[in-house]
Amino acid sequence: MSLPKFLACAVCGNQQEYEPFVPAICKSCGSQWLEAQYDYAAFKREILRGLPGRQFNLWRYQDILPLQNPASLDLYPAGGTPLWLSQRFAPPLGNKNVYIKDERYGPTSSFKDRQAAVAVAAMLEGGVKEAVIASTGNAAVAYAAACARAGIKLWVFMTSLVPQEKLREAA
C-alpha cells in the first residue's frame, strides 16, 4: 500500500491527512495546490523485496501504487509492453541507447491503459459503481475496457470530431 503519508500545501506549508476521494484543498488557507508526500525509503524496501517472481505488468509495482489491497482485486492487465532498442533514431540523436516503448501490445493499444487500470482499481476499492469520462478517444477506450472488466458502469462523452472507430471501441 502506498498512500501518501500526508498532503503538504505548497502555499502555506500546512500538512494534513490524505483522504481518498475527497478534494485536496488546504484546510488552513484554502489553496488547491497540495502535494502528496510519500515514504520513499519504504518504497525502495518494498520494490527490492517484492519484484522477483511477480508477473511482468503494471501490477508488478503494486506496492507503490495508491491502492490499499490490489491483490484482492480482479485487475485489468495493463503494462508489461515491450521496450525496443531503436536502430533508426539512435544515430541521428547521437546516442546509441534510444529505446521506444511499444504500447500496441497493451489491452487497448494505448499508454492510457495504465492510468485506467490504476484509477479503476481505486474506484473498486472506493466502492464506486458508476463513473463519467470526457475524452477524444484513447482514454475513453481504455477506461471503457477497464470499467467493463470491473463491472463499473461508465458514461462516456465524446465530441462529434472523434473518429468512428474510437466511438465503436468505447461503446
Predicted segment positions?
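PLP-dependent amino-acid enzyme catalytic core
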Residues: 1-171
